[in-house]
A protein has these predicted regions:
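Broad hydrophobic/π-residue packing in well-ordered secondary structure
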Residues: 61, 96, 107, 130, ...
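Short, surface-exposed loop and linker segments with low hydrophobicity and enrichment for Pro/Ser/Thr
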Residues: 109, 174-189, 239-247
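Catalytic phosphate/metal-binding cores of nucleic-acid and nucleotide-processing enzymes, i.e., regions
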Residues: 1, 10, 212, 222-225
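Alpha-helical scaffold segments
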Residues: 1-178
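Generic structural signal for residues positioned in beta-strands
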Residues: 138, 189-190, 250
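Core subunits and conserved enzymes of cellular information-processing
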Residues: 177-217
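ADP-ribosyltransferase catalytic core
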Residues: 216-280
Length: 280
């Protein structure tokens, strides 16, 4: 896990002969001004992965950044992706960037349809239009479909997929199989560990959590996938076991927003609200 350095001040920093630029590029939260000042020293592969960069900055240093990492770890607009369509990694773009159906259609020959079928939110109309490109098994377990659509295409939904579970079914599972406390039969209070700067541990450039705010994401609803996409939360101990070097947050998740609860009682959800920071 990424751990930030202590007592690092960009204003007073003076490099020396044995300065570990790899360590700084990975573990210190750097400003774009600092990165530019030491552009010939920093490790651009790790800058591309671990630092939050603006599109303007990426453009300025387009020959230095790692475009594979740009496509995976930075949040890019469709306009920016289109401008640098020959530089970005379309495999990662198809997974890690949020794409509109219009954009996917425009670049249908570049996107990875297997990943599009799994990671992007698609309408039934769009799926039908590109029925020869999409991967139907993934469509059946990752896209929320109407009963009529499922019957029309003779799709089979495995029992391990929670995508169609009702609120009542989720509620019963929680009460029978976990120790999570259910409040008013409507929501649960659980925990999320984040970095010291309140950013996501796994995707620091995509989520920075603030008290009182609600966050949404697409979510893998398959119970047998322990580590997958979606907003995650645990018991207090589970959150600390995952990452204990940063902040611990109390979060609220409505029952209907739960995507699944894995065998290890890890929660993946579509939406959660940050309530407060837990001070030990």
């Amino acid at each position: 896990m990424r751990k930030t350095m202590n007592n690092f001040d960009e204003e007073t920093f003076v490099p020396y002969e044995n300065t570990d630029w790899h360590y700084i590029s990975v573990y210190q939260i750097l400003s774009e001004k600092f990165i530019e000042k030491y552009k010939n020293k920093v490790d651009w592969h790790y800058i591309s992965q671990y630092q939050t960069l603006s599109e303007k900055f990426i453009e300025k240093f387009k020959d230095e950044v790692n475009w594979h990492y740009m496509s995976k770890y930075q949040t890019l607009s469709e306009k920016f992706i289109e401008k640098y369509k020959d530089k970005v990694n379309w495999f990662d773009i198809s997974i890690f960037q949020t794409l509109s159906e219009e954009f996917i259609e425009k670049f249908e020959d570049k996107v990875d349809w297997y990943r599009i079928s799994k990671y992007q939110k698609l309408s039934e109309k769009f799926i039908e239009k590109f029925e020869d490109e999409v991967y139907w098994y993934d469509i059946s377990i990752y896209q929320k479909l109407s009963k009529e659509f499922i019957e029309k295409y003779n799709l089979t939904i495995p029992k391990s997929c929670w995508l169609y579970k009702t609120k009542k079914e989720k509620l019963n599972y929680i009460k029978e199989n976990t120790n999570y406390e259910v409040i008013d039969n409507n929501y649960i209070l659980v925990y999320k560990s984040v970095r010291d700067d309140y950013k996501s541990v796994f995707f620091p450039n995509k989520y920075k959590y603030e008290i009182g705010k609600t966050y949404e994401s697409n979510c893998d609803c398959n119970i047998d996938e322990d580590n997958s996409f979606g907003l995650s939360a645990w018991s207090e101990q589970g959150a600390l076991d995952y990452y204990s070097e940063g902040k611990l947050l109390l979060v609220k998740i409505n029952i209907e927003d739960i995507g699944t609860i894995t065998f290890y009682n890890k929660i993946r959800c579509f939406k959660l609200t940050i309530l407060e920071e837990i001070n030990e």
